[in-house]
Amino acid sequence: MAYMFFNKYKIPEVVIKNGKKYIYDKVRKKDILFTPEEKVRQQVLTYLIDELKVPEYMIDEETAMSYYKVVSSKRPDILILKKDEKTGEAVPMAVIECKRNNTLIDGVIIEQTLHYAEQLGCNYAMITDGDYVDVAYCELDNKMLVSIKSLPTYEDMLNGIYEEIL
């Protein structure tokens, strides 16, 4: 696990409606209730779009895994999509779980995220609480995990390029 402070990434302005705090999610194109976990998710989205150059239209949030033909009602926080070479459909290639700051990233959270990656056929999995980040490349064919330094750029993810932690 490595330090990666997402606090440097700007989030949309928080607005108050009916006494509750909301933030505009530019990927989902709607106001979302502002929670500590949502703050981390919005910082990660800014990082994905601005730093890793992930196109907004290739990001999915809080979508039931059943949408991707997985028998599950679970909803990963963020999915990064790619075009399937055979069908042309958008399919997940990375799963990201965001937790509120100071959340202990324990075995349960890691197992949950890796289970999502396996079920969805994702080659990349990332977990963060906004301060710490854990990233893995998932070799789906031989069920191996490689700890990597950080999530690669979108282009590198498409090409299976990553930097392993030695």
Say what each PLM segment does.
Residues 1-124, 131-166:
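A short, conserved, highly charged catalytic patch centered on acidic carboxylates
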